[in-house]
Protein backbone atom coordinates (compact mmCIF):
# COMPACT_ATOMS: atom_id res chain seq x y z
CA UNK A 1 0.00 0.00 0.00
CA UNK A 2 1.33 3.42 -0.96
CA UNK A 3 2.25 6.09 1.59
CA UNK A 4 1.62 8.87 -0.95
CA UNK A 5 -1.36 10.19 1.04
CA UNK A 6 1.09 11.11 3.81
CA UNK A 7 3.87 12.61 1.69
CA UNK A 8 6.22 12.04 -1.21
CA UNK A 9 8.33 9.33 0.47
CA UNK A 10 10.58 7.63 -2.08
CA UNK A 11 13.83 6.61 -0.36
CA UNK A 12 13.96 4.00 2.38
CA UNK A 13 15.32 6.63 4.79
CA UNK A 14 12.28 8.84 4.13
CA UNK A 15 9.89 5.92 4.59
CA UNK A 16 11.72 4.87 7.76
CA UNK A 17 11.46 8.38 9.20
CA UNK A 18 7.71 8.44 8.58
CA UNK A 19 7.06 4.92 9.90
CA UNK A 20 9.03 5.67 13.08
CA UNK A 21 6.58 8.45 13.94
CA UNK A 22 3.51 6.64 12.61
CA UNK A 23 4.05 3.60 14.85
CA UNK A 24 5.66 5.30 17.87
CA UNK A 25 2.80 4.29 20.18
CA UNK A 26 3.63 0.63 19.50
CA UNK A 27 7.39 0.56 18.93
CA UNK A 28 10.28 2.83 19.94
CA UNK A 29 13.30 0.55 19.41
CA UNK A 30 15.45 0.39 16.29
CA UNK A 31 13.85 -0.72 13.04
CA UNK A 32 15.62 -3.23 10.82
CA UNK A 33 15.92 -1.86 7.29
CA UNK A 34 16.25 -4.09 4.24
CA UNK A 35 17.28 -2.47 0.98
CA UNK A 36 16.81 -3.63 -2.59
CA UNK A 37 18.80 -2.93 -5.72
CA UNK A 38 17.23 0.01 -7.53
CA UNK A 39 17.06 -1.51 -11.02
CA UNK A 40 15.79 -4.80 -12.43
CA UNK A 41 14.31 -5.89 -9.11
CA UNK A 42 10.73 -6.58 -10.13
CA UNK A 43 9.77 -10.03 -11.44
CA UNK A 44 6.28 -9.08 -12.59
CA UNK A 45 5.29 -6.40 -15.10
CA UNK A 46 1.98 -5.56 -16.78
CA UNK A 47 1.69 -3.31 -19.82
CA UNK A 48 -0.99 -2.19 -22.23
CA UNK A 49 -0.66 -2.16 -26.01
CA UNK A 50 -1.28 1.00 -28.02
CA UNK A 51 -2.22 0.70 -31.70
CA UNK A 52 -1.35 3.56 -34.09
CA UNK A 53 -1.00 3.62 -37.89
CA UNK A 54 -1.16 -0.16 -38.10
CA UNK A 55 1.73 -0.63 -35.70
CA UNK A 56 2.00 -1.57 -32.06
CA UNK A 57 3.62 -0.03 -28.98
CA UNK A 58 3.91 -0.93 -25.32
CA UNK A 59 2.11 1.66 -23.24
CA UNK A 60 0.96 2.68 -19.79
CA UNK A 61 -2.05 4.85 -19.04
CA UNK A 62 -2.36 7.27 -16.15
CA UNK A 63 -5.37 5.99 -14.15
CA UNK A 64 -6.55 9.53 -13.37
CA UNK A 65 -5.89 11.54 -16.53
CA UNK A 66 -6.00 8.54 -18.92
CA UNK A 67 -2.93 10.02 -20.60
CA UNK A 68 -0.90 7.39 -22.44
CA UNK A 69 2.84 6.90 -22.17
CA UNK A 70 4.72 4.88 -24.79
CA UNK A 71 7.04 2.45 -23.00
CA UNK A 72 10.29 1.29 -24.57
CA UNK A 73 12.10 0.03 -21.48
CA UNK A 74 11.30 -0.79 -17.85
CA UNK A 75 14.39 -0.28 -15.74
CA UNK A 76 12.66 -1.72 -12.66
CA UNK A 77 11.81 -5.00 -14.42
CA UNK A 78 13.87 -8.18 -14.25
CA UNK A 79 16.63 -8.37 -16.88
CA UNK A 80 14.87 -11.30 -18.59
CA UNK A 81 11.76 -9.15 -19.08
CA UNK A 82 13.80 -6.22 -20.43
CA UNK A 83 15.66 -8.47 -22.87
CA UNK A 84 12.48 -10.14 -24.13
CA UNK A 85 10.27 -7.06 -24.56
CA UNK A 86 11.74 -5.87 -27.90
CA UNK A 87 11.83 -9.41 -29.32
CA UNK A 88 8.14 -9.92 -28.54
CA UNK A 89 7.12 -6.52 -29.89
CA UNK A 90 9.00 -7.04 -33.17
CA UNK A 91 7.35 -10.45 -33.66
CA UNK A 92 3.85 -9.14 -32.90
CA UNK A 93 4.24 -6.20 -35.29
CA UNK A 94 4.88 -8.63 -38.15
CA UNK A 95 1.77 -10.75 -37.54
CA UNK A 96 -1.52 -8.94 -38.23
CA UNK A 97 -3.62 -11.69 -36.65
CA UNK A 98 -1.63 -11.64 -33.42
CA UNK A 99 -1.69 -7.87 -33.00
CA UNK A 100 -5.40 -7.46 -33.87
CA UNK A 101 -7.46 -6.68 -30.73
CA UNK A 102 -4.42 -7.31 -28.53
CA UNK A 103 -4.68 -5.00 -25.52
CA UNK A 104 -2.32 -6.18 -22.79
CA UNK A 105 0.67 -8.27 -21.77
CA UNK A 106 1.87 -9.68 -18.44
CA UNK A 107 5.44 -10.80 -17.84
CA UNK A 108 6.43 -13.07 -14.95
CA UNK A 109 9.92 -14.31 -14.16
CA UNK A 110 11.72 -16.44 -11.62
CA UNK A 111 15.48 -16.83 -11.27
CA UNK A 112 15.34 -19.51 -13.95
CA UNK A 113 12.33 -18.86 -16.18
CA UNK A 114 10.01 -16.41 -17.94
CA UNK A 115 6.36 -16.61 -18.94
CA UNK A 116 4.31 -14.20 -21.05
CA UNK A 117 0.53 -13.71 -21.05
CA UNK A 118 -1.17 -11.94 -23.97
CA UNK A 119 -4.63 -10.44 -23.42
CA UNK A 120 -7.16 -10.21 -26.27
CA UNK A 121 -10.56 -8.75 -27.05
CA UNK A 122 -11.38 -11.58 -29.47
CA UNK A 123 -11.71 -15.35 -29.65
CA UNK A 124 -8.16 -16.64 -29.21
CA UNK A 125 -9.12 -20.03 -30.69
CA UNK A 126 -9.04 -18.30 -34.10
CA UNK A 127 -5.32 -17.53 -33.74
CA UNK A 128 -4.23 -20.68 -31.93
CA UNK A 129 -1.71 -21.70 -34.61
CA UNK A 130 -0.20 -18.18 -34.69
CA UNK A 131 0.20 -18.24 -30.93
CA UNK A 132 1.80 -21.66 -31.04
CA UNK A 133 4.28 -20.43 -33.65
CA UNK A 134 5.10 -17.44 -31.44
CA UNK A 135 5.79 -19.72 -28.48
CA UNK A 136 7.97 -22.05 -30.55
CA UNK A 137 9.87 -19.40 -32.49
CA UNK A 138 10.70 -17.28 -29.45
CA UNK A 139 11.12 -20.31 -27.13
CA UNK A 140 8.75 -18.90 -24.55
CA UNK A 141 6.14 -20.20 -22.10
CA UNK A 142 3.06 -18.45 -23.48
CA UNK A 143 -0.46 -17.98 -22.16
CA UNK A 144 -3.21 -16.27 -24.14
CA UNK A 145 -6.42 -15.04 -22.53
CA UNK A 146 -9.69 -13.66 -23.78
CA UNK A 147 -13.12 -13.54 -22.16
CA UNK A 148 -13.82 -17.01 -20.76
CA UNK A 149 -10.86 -18.63 -22.56
CA UNK A 150 -7.25 -19.48 -21.79
CA UNK A 151 -4.71 -21.20 -24.04
CA UNK A 152 -1.35 -22.47 -22.77
CA UNK A 153 1.70 -23.13 -24.94
CA UNK A 154 4.55 -25.11 -23.37
CA UNK A 155 3.61 -24.58 -19.68
CA UNK A 156 2.11 -21.94 -17.42
CA UNK A 157 3.99 -23.22 -14.36
CA UNK A 158 7.28 -21.66 -13.33
CA UNK A 159 9.97 -23.02 -11.02
CA UNK A 160 11.72 -20.94 -8.40
CA UNK A 161 14.59 -21.52 -5.99
CA UNK A 162 15.07 -19.34 -2.90
CA UNK A 163 18.25 -19.26 -0.83
CA UNK A 164 17.37 -19.11 2.86
CA UNK A 165 20.07 -19.48 5.54
CA UNK A 166 22.26 -21.74 3.39
CA UNK A 167 19.22 -23.80 2.38
CA UNK A 168 17.67 -24.05 -1.07
CA UNK A 169 13.85 -24.01 -1.09
CA UNK A 170 12.14 -25.15 -4.29
CA UNK A 171 8.79 -23.87 -5.53
CA UNK A 172 6.44 -24.18 -8.46
CA UNK A 173 3.59 -21.76 -9.17
CA UNK A 174 1.84 -19.93 -12.01
CA UNK A 175 0.82 -16.35 -12.66
CA UNK A 176 -2.58 -16.83 -11.02
CA UNK A 177 -0.79 -17.18 -7.66
CA UNK A 178 -0.03 -14.22 -5.44
CA UNK A 179 3.74 -13.79 -5.77
CA UNK A 180 6.14 -11.51 -3.92
CA UNK A 181 7.39 -9.50 -6.93
CA UNK A 182 10.88 -8.73 -5.59
CA UNK A 183 12.73 -12.03 -5.17
CA UNK A 184 15.71 -10.61 -3.28
CA UNK A 185 13.43 -8.85 -0.79
CA UNK A 186 11.31 -11.99 -0.50
CA UNK A 187 14.43 -13.93 0.52
CA UNK A 188 15.28 -11.22 3.06
CA UNK A 189 11.75 -11.30 4.53
CA UNK A 190 11.78 -15.06 4.97
CA UNK A 191 15.32 -14.97 6.39
CA UNK A 192 14.29 -12.26 8.88
CA UNK A 193 11.51 -14.51 10.16
CA UNK A 194 13.88 -17.49 10.37
CA UNK A 195 16.41 -15.48 12.38
CA UNK A 196 13.71 -14.58 14.90
CA UNK A 197 12.60 -18.20 15.15
CA UNK A 198 16.18 -19.28 15.82
CA UNK A 199 15.95 -17.49 19.18
CA UNK A 200 12.50 -18.81 20.12
CA UNK A 201 11.06 -21.78 21.93
CA UNK A 202 8.88 -23.36 19.25
CA UNK A 203 6.13 -25.97 19.08
CA UNK A 204 3.68 -25.84 16.14
CA UNK A 205 2.98 -23.09 13.60
CA UNK A 206 -0.36 -21.78 12.38
CA UNK A 207 -0.14 -19.87 9.09
CA UNK A 208 -3.02 -17.95 7.52
CA UNK A 209 -3.04 -16.83 3.86
CA UNK A 210 -0.27 -19.30 2.99
CA UNK A 211 -0.62 -19.12 -0.82
CA UNK A 212 1.57 -21.66 -2.59
CA UNK A 213 3.76 -22.04 0.52
CA UNK A 214 6.19 -19.14 0.10
CA UNK A 215 6.86 -18.83 3.85
CA UNK A 216 5.50 -22.24 4.80
CA UNK A 217 8.18 -24.39 3.20
CA UNK A 218 11.03 -22.32 4.62
CA UNK A 219 9.61 -22.21 8.16
CA UNK A 220 8.47 -25.83 8.45
CA UNK A 221 11.86 -27.16 9.73
CA UNK A 222 11.57 -24.89 12.78
CA UNK A 223 8.37 -26.57 14.03
CA UNK A 224 7.04 -30.00 14.93
CA UNK A 225 3.90 -29.48 12.85
CA UNK A 226 2.48 -26.72 10.65
CA UNK A 227 -1.16 -25.98 9.83
CA UNK A 228 -1.42 -23.63 6.85
CA UNK A 229 -4.69 -22.29 5.44
CA UNK A 230 -5.57 -20.75 2.09
CA UNK A 231 -8.86 -20.30 0.22
CA UNK A 232 -7.52 -20.84 -3.31
CA UNK A 233 -7.71 -24.45 -4.46
CA UNK A 234 -4.97 -23.98 -7.07
CA UNK A 235 -2.67 -22.42 -4.46
CA UNK A 236 -3.24 -25.39 -2.16
CA UNK A 237 -2.41 -27.77 -5.01
CA UNK A 238 0.85 -25.91 -5.67
CA UNK A 239 1.63 -25.91 -1.94
CA UNK A 240 1.20 -29.70 -1.80
CA UNK A 241 3.44 -30.09 -4.83
CA UNK A 242 6.03 -27.83 -3.24
CA UNK A 243 6.07 -30.05 -0.16
CA UNK A 244 7.01 -32.94 -2.44
CA UNK A 245 9.74 -30.88 -4.12
CA UNK A 246 11.28 -30.18 -0.71
CA UNK A 247 10.61 -33.59 0.89
CA UNK A 248 8.62 -31.82 3.61
CA UNK A 249 6.16 -33.97 5.54
CA UNK A 250 5.12 -31.95 8.62
CA UNK A 251 2.80 -29.44 6.90
CA UNK A 252 -0.99 -29.87 6.85
CA UNK A 253 -2.87 -27.65 4.41
CA UNK A 254 -6.54 -26.73 4.76
CA UNK A 255 -8.60 -24.88 2.15
CA UNK A 256 -10.37 -22.59 4.57
CA UNK A 257 -10.83 -18.87 4.96
CA UNK A 258 -9.49 -17.34 8.15
CA UNK A 259 -13.05 -16.83 9.35
CA UNK A 260 -13.87 -20.51 8.75
CA UNK A 261 -10.74 -21.61 10.60
CA UNK A 262 -11.76 -19.45 13.54
CA UNK A 263 -15.14 -21.20 13.67
CA UNK A 264 -13.47 -24.60 13.45
CA UNK A 265 -10.96 -23.92 16.24
CA UNK A 266 -13.75 -22.63 18.49
CA UNK A 267 -15.70 -25.81 17.60
CA UNK A 268 -18.62 -23.71 16.43
CA UNK A 269 -18.72 -25.46 13.05
CA UNK A 270 -17.33 -28.61 11.46
CA UNK A 271 -15.84 -28.61 7.97
CA UNK A 272 -15.51 -31.58 5.63
CA UNK A 273 -12.28 -30.02 4.38
CA UNK A 274 -10.81 -30.68 7.84
CA UNK A 275 -11.85 -34.33 7.98
CA UNK A 276 -8.23 -35.55 7.90
CA UNK A 277 -6.90 -32.93 10.33
CA UNK A 278 -7.33 -33.08 14.11
CA UNK A 279 -7.06 -29.51 15.35
CA UNK A 280 -6.72 -30.71 18.94
CA UNK A 281 -3.40 -32.36 18.02
CA UNK A 282 -1.75 -28.98 17.41
CA UNK A 283 -0.01 -26.89 20.05
CA UNK A 284 0.54 -23.56 18.30
CA UNK A 285 3.38 -21.48 19.72
CA UNK A 286 3.50 -19.14 16.72
CA UNK A 287 1.08 -17.76 14.15
CA UNK A 288 2.09 -16.15 10.86
CA UNK A 289 -0.23 -13.86 8.93
CA UNK A 290 0.43 -12.26 5.55
CA UNK A 291 -2.98 -10.74 4.79
CA UNK A 292 -4.18 -8.75 1.77
CA UNK A 293 -4.20 -4.94 1.87
CA UNK A 294 -7.43 -4.89 3.87
CA UNK A 295 -5.57 -6.37 6.83
CA UNK A 296 -7.12 -8.63 9.46
CA UNK A 297 -10.79 -8.51 10.39
CA UNK A 298 -11.98 -8.80 13.98
CA UNK A 299 -12.63 -12.54 13.87
CA UNK A 300 -9.05 -13.22 12.78
CA UNK A 301 -7.60 -10.84 15.39
CA UNK A 302 -9.67 -12.57 18.07
CA UNK A 303 -8.29 -15.90 16.87
CA UNK A 304 -4.58 -15.06 16.68
CA UNK A 305 -4.33 -13.04 19.88
CA UNK A 306 -4.79 -16.29 21.83
CA UNK A 307 -1.33 -17.43 20.77
CA UNK A 308 2.00 -16.55 22.36
CA UNK A 309 3.82 -15.22 19.29
CA UNK A 310 2.55 -13.46 16.16
CA UNK A 311 4.50 -12.75 12.97
CA UNK A 312 2.66 -10.19 10.83
CA UNK A 313 3.81 -9.45 7.27
CA UNK A 314 2.01 -6.38 5.94
CA UNK A 315 1.79 -4.68 2.55
CA UNK A 316 -0.32 -1.88 4.04
CA UNK A 317 1.02 0.16 7.00
CA UNK A 318 -2.38 1.81 7.44
CA UNK A 319 -4.31 -1.40 8.14
CA UNK A 320 -1.31 -2.75 10.07
CA UNK A 321 -1.59 0.18 12.47
CA UNK A 322 -5.33 -0.39 12.88
CA UNK A 323 -4.72 -4.08 13.64
CA UNK A 324 -1.93 -3.27 16.12
CA UNK A 325 -4.38 -1.15 18.12
CA UNK A 326 -6.25 -4.38 18.86
CA UNK A 327 -3.27 -6.72 19.11
CA UNK A 328 -1.39 -4.38 21.47
CA UNK A 329 -4.03 -5.07 24.13
CA UNK A 330 -2.58 -8.57 24.51
CA UNK A 331 0.81 -8.45 22.74
CA UNK A 332 3.92 -6.29 22.60
CA UNK A 333 5.86 -5.47 19.41
CA UNK A 334 9.34 -6.97 19.86
CA UNK A 335 10.77 -6.52 16.35
CA UNK A 336 9.85 -4.25 13.44
CA UNK A 337 11.39 -4.56 9.98
CA UNK A 338 10.96 -2.44 6.84
CA UNK A 339 11.47 -3.98 3.41
CA UNK A 340 11.95 -1.68 0.42
CA UNK A 341 10.03 -3.92 -1.95
CA UNK A 342 9.38 -1.25 -4.60
CA UNK A 343 12.39 1.06 -4.74
CA UNK A 344 11.84 4.80 -5.35
CA UNK A 345 8.09 4.48 -4.80
CA UNK A 346 5.95 5.29 -1.73
CA UNK A 347 5.23 1.56 -1.24
CA UNK A 348 6.61 -0.22 1.83
CA UNK A 349 6.42 -3.78 3.15
CA UNK A 350 6.54 -4.25 6.93
CA UNK A 351 7.33 -7.20 9.16
CA UNK A 352 6.30 -7.18 12.83
CA UNK A 353 7.01 -9.75 15.52
CA UNK A 354 4.78 -9.65 18.61
CA UNK A 355 4.85 -11.66 21.82
CA UNK A 356 2.23 -11.96 24.52
CA UNK A 357 2.47 -9.44 27.34
From Swiss-Prot:
Catalytic activity entry: uridine(54) in tRNA + S-adenosyl-L-methionine = 5-methyluridine(54) in tRNA + S-adenosyl-L-homocysteine + H(+); uridine(341) in tmRNA + S-adenosyl-L-methionine = 5-methyluridine(341) in tmRNA + S-adenosyl-L-homocysteine + H(+)
List of residues binding S-adenosyl-L-methionine: 180, 209, 214, 230, 290
Keyword Repeat in annotation: no
Enzyme class: transferase
Any one annotated GO CC term: cytosol
Active site (UniProt): 315 (nucleophile), 349 (proton acceptor)
Gene Ontology biological-process annotations: methylation; tRNA processing
Similarity field: Belongs to the class I-like SAM-binding methyltransferase superfamily. RNA M5U methyltransferase family. TrmA subfamily.
Protein's name in the database: tRNA/tmRNA (uracil-C(5))-methyltransferase
Origin species: Campylobacter jejuni subsp. jejuni serotype O:23/36 (strain 81-176)
Organism phylogeny: Bacteria, Pseudomonadati, Campylobacterota, Epsilonproteobacteria, Campylobacterales
Gene name, Swiss-Prot/TrEMBL: trmA
Amino acid sequence: MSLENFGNFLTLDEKHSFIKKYFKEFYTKDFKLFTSKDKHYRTRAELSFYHENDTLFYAMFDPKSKKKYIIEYLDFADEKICAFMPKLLEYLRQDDKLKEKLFGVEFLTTKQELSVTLLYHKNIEDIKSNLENLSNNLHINLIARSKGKKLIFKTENLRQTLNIQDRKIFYEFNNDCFIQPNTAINEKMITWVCEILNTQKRMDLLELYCGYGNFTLALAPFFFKVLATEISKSNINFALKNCELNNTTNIHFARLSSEELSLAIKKEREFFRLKDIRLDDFNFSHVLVDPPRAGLDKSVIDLIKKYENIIYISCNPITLKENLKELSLTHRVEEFALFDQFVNTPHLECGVFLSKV
